[in-house]
């Protein structure tokens, strides 16, 4: 057993918890779809260099009253790593009502129908987050998700909202890749081995979970290309749920580090302690490894082999390796553990 696999047994399984607002959102959004819609052909995916439309089938439609909508159908390929559909729809509903995501119209089974934004809206690109205004708006939107449980961080039992663990997710995906006979690049276990002190200390370093979007990719931001002052909206939500907020900060750093932001500034804007930057940086590296494994796994099991997820996965792994080598606070902490 390697040091990487040995850590897996220390990880706590996901549980289902949440707040009152989300419980009510789950009840409302779970009603059957009864409206009549006319749908176009599904949108094409764009996996390289982003992950646009890769977590489901997206189709535009028009209702009987002329209302334009976007249908997201969750496909089998995402079930291994995505939050449960009912958890995603509950959070999407709450975020839409809060004005930080497109409004959910209807939902049932494996489909979510939300409002279709005007054509000027599109997914953001990484280099656009060099714009300080857009970056701060994006971080504010993510922080707003933390408050969707009515501002209370005390978690009560509720239907639908899943609690996630990034450490657990990494090792589950690693095992699934091995079960599928997927060759793992040496950097996967190399990175996990170097992070062993961080993985061993994850329980002691953990913070109370809050509701999070969970994926810091720029493509999960919708921006109005005609008005840079309009706050962006969040999209995606594939790995949303209750989680350690430093995990989400890490996912944001995984996307932004050395590209568009000062790392400590990101934490402060998210309402987190910048003195604990090394924790977010450790999670940033793990987030890169997770999406590298997801990319490899999707390339193996996708029914449509024309969609190349491997390049995206390898891009994330290269970033993870580079960030592990260049995060000063994380490396200082790791050195102190030796």
Q: Where does each model-flagged region fall?
A:
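Conserved NTP-binding catalytic cores of kinases and kinase-like/nucleotidyltransferase enzymes
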Residues: 1-103, 110, 200, 205, ...
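Intrinsically disordered, low-complexity acidic/proline-/asparagine-rich linker or regulatory tail/stalk regions
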Residues: 3-5, 14-15, 311, 321-338
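ATP-binding pocket architecture of kinase catalytic cores
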Residues: 52-161, 165, 182
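Active-site activation/catalytic loop segments of kinase-like enzymes and analogous catalytic loops
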Residues: 246-275, 285-304, 311, 316-324
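An alpha-helical support segment within catalytic cores of ATP-dependent transferases
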Residues: 21-41, 147-214, 218, 224-227, ...
């Amino acid at each position: 057993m390697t040091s990487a696999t040995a850590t897996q047994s220390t990880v706590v399984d996901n549980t289902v918890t949440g707040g009152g607002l989300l419980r009510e959102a789950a009840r409302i959004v779970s009603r059957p779809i009864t409206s009549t819609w006319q749908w176009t052909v599904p949108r094409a995916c764009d996996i390289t260099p982003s992950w646009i439309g890769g977590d489901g089938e997206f189709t535009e439609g028009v209702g009987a009253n002329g209302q334009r909508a976007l249908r997201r159908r969750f496909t089998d390929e995402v079930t291994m790593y995505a939050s449960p559909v009912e958890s995603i729809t509950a959070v999407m509903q709450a975020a839409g009502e809060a004005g930080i995501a497109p409004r959910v119209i209807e939902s049932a089974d494996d489909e979510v129908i939300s409002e279709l934004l005007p054509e000027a809206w599109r997914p953001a690109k990484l280099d656009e987050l060099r714009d300080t205004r857009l970056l701060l708006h994006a971080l504010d939107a993510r922080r707003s998700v933390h408050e969707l449980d009515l501002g209370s961080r005390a978690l009560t039992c509720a239907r639908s909202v899943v609690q996630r663990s990034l450490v657990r997710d990494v090792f589950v995906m690693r095992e699934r890749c091995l079960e599928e006979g997927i060759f793992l690049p040496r950097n996967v276990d190399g990175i996990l081995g170097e992070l062993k002190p961080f993985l061993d200390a994850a329980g002691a370093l953990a913070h109370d979970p809050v509701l999070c979007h969970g994926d810091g990719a720029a493509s999960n931001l919708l921006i109005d290309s005609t008005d840079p002052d309009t706050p962006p909206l969040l999209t995606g939500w594939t790995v949303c749920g209750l989680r350690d907020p430093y995990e989400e900060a890490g996912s944001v750093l995984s996307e932004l580090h050395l590209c568009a932001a000062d790392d400590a500034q990101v934490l402060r804007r998210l309402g987190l302690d910048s003195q604990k930057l090394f924790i977010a940086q450790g999670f940033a590296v793990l987030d890169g490894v997770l999406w590298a494994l997801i990319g490899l796994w999707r390339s193996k099991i996708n029914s449509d082999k024309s969609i190349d997820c491997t390049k995206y996965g390898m891009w994330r792994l290269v970033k993870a390796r580079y960030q592990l080598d260049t995060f000063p606070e994380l490396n200082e902490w790791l050195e102190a553990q030796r």
